[in-house]
Design a protein with these regions (language model features):
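Short amphipathic alpha-helical segments with coiled-coil-like heptad repeat character
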Residues: 39-41, 67, 119
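Cationic, histidine-enriched alpha-helical/coil surfaces that engage anionic ligands
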Residues: 47-87
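Low-complexity, intrinsically disordered regions enriched in charged/polar residues
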Residues: 25, 53, 61, 65, ...
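A general "terminal functional-core" signal
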Residues: 1-8, 13-16, 70-376
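N-terminal low-complexity, Ser/Thr- and acidic-residue-enriched intrinsically disordered segments
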Residues: 1-61
Length: 376
């Protein structure tokens, strides 16, 4: 029997990247309220857990102590003249009060999800405030200060577990790839908008790992305007075969929904139902699953997608019409059709062909270069 855990804290409402920043903490409370309205926070086989802030020593397993001290200093309001050298300052990674505590909370939630799965207290755990996959050992990057995904995988590896990481965010999961680039015990797979069109500028097929880890970093770059049909053709051709061949003990999935067709920062063209299809395809690929959030800058997409993902983790079929209790939130944020699913739209033939041809070339390269290294 599947037992599940969801990790959530309303403490997130105390943190704020700034009024003009696209990453809005409001999305977390909005998601939680939609889950509540659907009855998903009181399921009989699911337990709600509150995260504790990660200790400095846990964060230092991946991040340098020098960088951690800089984070603590700027968070406390100290003047750090070289903060920009650590990726901190106006723009993507602003300095705000409580920055360090927010980073600790995010890391703590993902570490808790990993522990619950490793200890057998849950077969599937979801920390939707996590998935901040860009942070590097010594610098912030892409709205991410501490890489909770890396820390969660490290905790699972401490237990001797073999881990596959699949990242379906629109942005390449560069920080996670970097952390395990030479490690054959961690398979990282990222599907994302091509790096020459979108931050962070990486994630090409030729980034395959190195040394003992050669073939264990897999990237599926996609053309802007890639829709559900093109995405799933590429996804099916690459992800299930490689994950199945790898035989992970635990699957860690990063569920960024900035791949959505109305996301303001990216250029892919998935729907909520296309996203959910990918989640449902991933869940059976390993006996245990740790799910994390990620990108997503249209708040109604975030709430609907992560609610649908949590329902899938619990094998619950949801009504397509959004619960009445959620209508005020959704209408306030501009959602026109009060449905869990998006209206069906057909890509123009030239756009579909352009995306399809590019995706098929990437898949062909992966099958030629990486599949043989896994006996495929």
């Amino acid at each position: 029997m599947t037992t599940t855990a969801i990790v959530y804290s309303d403490e997130w409402r105390h943190f704020d990247y700034g009024r003009e920043h696209p990453l809005r903490m409001e999305r977390l409370g909005l998601t939680w309220r939609l889950m509540e309205a659907y009855g998903l926070t009181a399921l009989p086989r699911a337990k709600v857990w509150a995260p504790e802030r990660a200790e400095l020593e846990e964060i230092a397993r991946f991040h340098s102590r020098e960088y951690i001290e800089i984070l603590r200093a700027v968070s406390a309001g100290d003047w750090v003249p070289n903060a920009a050298g650590y990726g901190l300052g106006p723009g993507d990674n602003p300095i705000f009060p409580g920055l360090w505590e927010a980073a600790q909370l995010g890391a703590g939630g993902s570490l808790l999800a990993a522990r619950l799965v490793a200890d057998g207290e849950a077969t599937r755990a979801f920390h939707f405030a996590g998935g901040l996959h860009h942070a590097m050992p010594g610098r912030a990057s892409g709205f991410c200060y501490v890489n909770d995904a890396v820390l969660a995988i490290m905790r699972l590896r401490q237990r001797g577990l073999r881990v596959a990481y699949v990242d379906i965010d629109a942005h390449h999961g560069d920080g996670v790839q970097f952390a395990f680039y030479d490690d054959p015990n961690v398979l990282t797979v990222s599907t994302h908008e091509r790096g020459d069109r979108l931050f962070p500028g990486t994630g090409f097929v030729v980034e395959m790992g190195e040394g003992a880890g050669l073939g264990y970093s897999v990237n599926v770059p996609l053309q802007p305007l890639t829709d559900d049909a093109v995405y799933h053709e590429a996804f099916e051709a690459v992800v299930p075969p490689l994950v199945t061949a790898f035989k992970p003990d635990v699957l860690v999935i990063q569920l960024g929904i900035d791949s959505h067709r109305t996301d303001p920062l990216t250029h892919l063209s998935l729907t909520v139902q296309g996203f959910t299809r990918a989640v449902k395809r991933l869940l059976p690929l390993a006996p245990r699953v740790v799910a994390l959030g990620g990108g997503g800058y249209d708040l109604t997409n975030v709430a609907r997608a992560w609610t649908a993902a949590w329902a899938a983790m619990n094998d619950v079929d949801l009504p397509r019409d959004l619960p009445r209790e959620s209508h005020r939130d959704m209408q306030r944020l501009g959602l026109g059709i009060l449905s869990l699913d998006d209206p069906v739209e057909t890509s123009p033939p030239d756009t579909r062909r352009w995306a399809e041809e590019y995706a098929r070339r990437q898949v062909g390269e992966i099958q030629d270069r990486i599949f043989p290294l896994h006996g495929l």
